[in-house]
């Protein structure tokens, strides 16, 4: 069984993932990391990954950009693979993700849903067909006024898919 640490365990996605994992017989969450400890979980929760003494095979991260630097440092130090799903990272943090990926396995995705990943592929194909014919491609998104990262990580990933198909011609 895969033993995972849920980084950002008390956030919305952390709680969703924790609930899904309870129903799975291939993976278990053995510890959680979150600054907010006011939610009861079926595993021990630590306020930082550095203080977590529970052995695990991987860290699943749905936290926030402010927590990513320490996360990467500790994962590299402990040679602990990480699934990085936090969005809103700075250019410096993205460079740090790339650097960490040279030392430990890092899977980074702005959106893990099958539908969004299919949409990214479809957008690449559409961009290859439409742009040479003179079409402009634009992404417009709407969110509630409490949205933490705008544009969203998903919108940036969609734009990156289009831009990749267009040999990085577009600026956003």
Positions of PLM-derived features:
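Short glycine-/small-residue-rich Rossmann-like dinucleotide-binding loops
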Residues: 63-64, 87
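N-terminal Rossmann-like NAD(P) cofactor-binding module of classical short-chain dehydrogenase/reductase
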Residues: 59-60
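NAD(P)-binding Rossmann-fold cofactor-contacting core
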Residues: 23-42
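Rossmann-fold NAD(P)-binding glycine/threonine-rich loop
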Residues: 72-73, 77, 86-108, 117-119, ...
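Short amphipathic alpha-helix with an adjacent loop that forms part of the alpha/beta core around
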Residues: 46-55
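Short, ordered loop/turn segments at secondary-structure junctions
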Residues: 34-35, 87-89, 111-112, 142-144
């Amino acid at each position: 069984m895969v033993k995972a640490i849920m980084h950002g365990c008390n956030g919305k996605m952390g709680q969703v993932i924790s609930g899904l994992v309870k129903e799975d017989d291939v993976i278990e969450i053995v510890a959680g990391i979150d600054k907010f400890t006011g939610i009861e979980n079926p595993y021990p929760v630590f306020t930082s990954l550095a203080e977590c003494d529970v052995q695990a095979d991987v860290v699943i991260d749905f936290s926030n950009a402010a927590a990513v630097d320490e996360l990467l440092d500790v994962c590299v130090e402990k040679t602990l693979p990480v699934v990085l799903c936090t969005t809103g990272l700075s250019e410096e943090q993205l460079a740090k993700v790339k650097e960490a990926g040279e030392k430990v396995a890092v899977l980074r995705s702005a959106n893990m849903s099958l539908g969004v990943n299919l949409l990214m592929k479809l957008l690449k194909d559409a961009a290859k067909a439409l742009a040479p014919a003179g079409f402009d491609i634009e992404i417009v998104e709407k969110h509630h006024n409490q949205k933490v990262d705008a544009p969203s990580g998903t919108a940036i990933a969609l734009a990156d898919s289009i831009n990749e198909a267009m040999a990085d011609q577009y600026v956003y």
